[in-house]
């Protein structure tokens, strides 16, 4: 029966396919809205990685799952895997350690400081485009080697954590002492929307300005690379030019010169490069472009064995050390022992070997017994010797092995944890005790927090301080909205708004900010003086509470009695705990919530609003209600009146939406101010309002207008206030990883 059923079903399927073939083709050729209206504001960044996309469900909490994990057992399994070479992808030198180090490095190494995107959190290396980047060739096999371990521990360890932890275990299994490990990287379930560049071809580079500088927020020199081309800028083997690019790209990952040298020298102590054949003649499509039968694997190599001694990855070929699966000083030793000359790999890529044929038999082959090679270096390796600053560091490390080892351990820890945010998010027993400046340290809570009665009394004192509702709201928003969810930095905790550099950011209106902070500091000091029993309140808490009681007052004046939630427990950081240059990248070039826009902005005002909302992890309705509420509260930067569509500024009314949707107003571009619009009465021609594109997009964009109509309806006021408070509270607590 089975033998006849299958062909019958196949014939039926074929007949149906032929019958409905026209419809299938039509579906494949659907033309989306973005084609017809390419300038239409894209709201999709605010809809990515929705809770509904998570197969574990809304009740799943990764931190709790991770805490139940026996990390020592996981480590034991990973160590065993290191030397269990698989026939379908044999280990170089019988050890997968170097392969897993590359996997972990390339997972974390896409992090960039300017927008906080990239990094190991989310496990994005599993998804396009990262899973198919030229710089990630064959890392699909590394993750498949790890699948049995991921399968065993399931929801208790994320791919993001597993990849980094495996890199750590790999280092330890080869004799290196790591600095520590922290779990806490929650997996994503779809590819993150990231601007990786506008190039249309791999390894192309069209990301520099007229001065030759890499455009922000890019972190790599070419499309599809993690950092730089190892052969030199655009393949030109110039070590000094390579050093310049290395310094720039690693700096964009928050690494200084010493950390950069430690990472490159430490990482290249292990493993080898793979360029046994010409990729153009041997290597097939990347994972994303491969057929379903490949099951997510790519770069199939048709030459020789297709792996082992025939492996093709970067096209460069060889090892740096004679013992590539052990921690040694050989990388730096050989770098300075030999003079290096250019040669080409079997794949035709430029690399370097010792001059005069020296050390021709120093390096054992990774797979063939009794076969040996000369050591090799990339152009980017020679850069560490030729650049004067890098040379000073490498020679010092060569003379001081323990200093080098600690520098690499700390740099590796920073590389793999930089995108996790503050230490409060770290999980596990291997978290190092030392507090590091790049972790944006905040003092641990050292006092009893105030209770509800204290909160009410403090709120009344803030309202009696002479500060206005707009001033309190603007200050609280400026403090809390510095948060960015891409790398969990910024936010109200720490009260860094009173420190350099935040206190002088243009968007924060420094003159007004100084006045408000002075009054709030006095309130804090006086109130703490009245408290007993070890209770205190931080300035960070006072700033947030000030905004919250101002919102309550504004809602009451609009006829809605509400209580804005407030959770004390924030602490105040010091200037010594604040790296000014590191925090400088958090400065907003635009903040549509405050109608602030500067000439340094990379996109239009409306697009920058979406970017800011995305950083704050807001949804489309949350963004909409916050903009409308902040306009009604008169919270624009520097008090500008654009978008304040109300005759009762400082009151939490839905007037912004009511008046935006009012057909008695006719909008036109201002003839006096570029980028400003004027709303005039259709009958009298009298000027009623002024607005920015950020204001008007809530009436012009069909989806945003749909949300605005909810809040602008006659029954919308109560909903508006309640939704505003929920969204406000979300922003105020965005960095409260302790609650």
Swiss-Prot record:
Residue ranges the record marks as coiled coil: none
Reaction it catalyzes: H2O2 + AH2 = A + 2 H2O; 2 H2O2 = O2 + 2 H2O
Crosslinked positions (Tryptophyl-tyrosyl-methioninium (Trp-Tyr) (with M-253)): 105-227
Annotated keywords: Heme, Hydrogen peroxide, Iron, Metal-binding, Oxidoreductase, Peroxidase, Signal
Xref: Pfam families: peroxidase (PF00141)
Paired cysteines (S-S): none
Gene Ontology CC annotation, any one: cytosol
Signal sequence annotation: 1-26
Active-site residues (renumbered): 106 (proton acceptor)
Entry annotated with the keyword Signal: yes
Cofactor(s) needed for function: heme b
Gene3D superfamilies found in the cross-reference section: 1.10.520.10, Peroxidase, domain 2
Enzyme class, UniProt record, top EC level: oxidoreductase
Residues noted as binding heme b in the record, renumbered to the chain: 268
One term of GO molecular function: catalase activity
Stored CDD domains: catalase_peroxidase_1, catalase_peroxidase_2
Cross-link (Tryptophyl-tyrosyl-methioninium (Tyr-Met) (with W-105)): 227-253
PTM: Formation of the three residue Trp-Tyr-Met cross-link is important for the catalase, but not the peroxidase activity of the enzyme.
GO biological process, one term: hydrogen peroxide catabolic process
Record note on quaternary structure: Homodimer or homotetramer.
Family: Belongs to the peroxidase family. Peroxidase/catalase subfamily.
Record function comment: Bifunctional enzyme with both catalase and broad-spectrum peroxidase activity.
Protein name in the entry: Catalase-peroxidase 2
Species of provenance: Shewanella sp. (strain MR-4)
Gene (name only): katG2
